[in-house]
């Protein structure tokens, strides 16, 4: 946590303001600035970042065909001016070690992973299962899974994380493609998808569906 924090930001996911007065240390890994720093770390430690990342996603989802949507990756690159600004801003604070374009290319590909709701739910199962995937492989330690679940609970929905906790009561993570994955530790993982996003960047109907799920079943962490 020297390069990325673990606190909620309370600001929009692509904000530069907080990053400036906190000297280039993103509040958490789920806002864009934090994800870009994590991408930089992976570029530093992986021999073939894009290939290794797609292999990891296939491993945790249990689907050998899960891959990048190259049209989406190109679209992200063509319109990713705010992310380019964030990466250069992070670089100015010494919190990006690799070439900016290399980091951005990897990040845009991460944003373009394409999968079904079932594959997304399966990919998140190890967070619900003390770090063990559906195929029985230990991906994380139980302690690491607990900490990531805590991060998802407090930071997984940008500046709407409190609202999601209040209404749904599960650790979860939203994506700009309209997907949401959530977990009930030691019980299950679940995913929703609807592309209509609210003003906070989260799937409106996905959040509603998960609220109905936990309300009607009484299954939440609270």
Language-model region placement:
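Active-site-adjacent helix/loop patches that line small-molecule binding or acyl-intermediate pockets
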Residues: 1-110
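Structured C-terminal helix/loop/strand segments within mature extracytoplasmic catalytic/sensor domains
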Residues: 128-222
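Short glycine/serine- and small hydrophobic-enriched flexible loop segments
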Residues: 39-44, 125-129, 215
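Penicillin-binding protein/beta-lactamase superfamily catalytic region
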Residues: 77, 88-147, 200-203
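Catalytic-loop motifs flanking and including active-site residues across diverse enzymes
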Residues: 30-37, 116-122, 186, 209
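Short glycine-rich loop/turn motifs
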Residues: 85-87, 120, 177-180
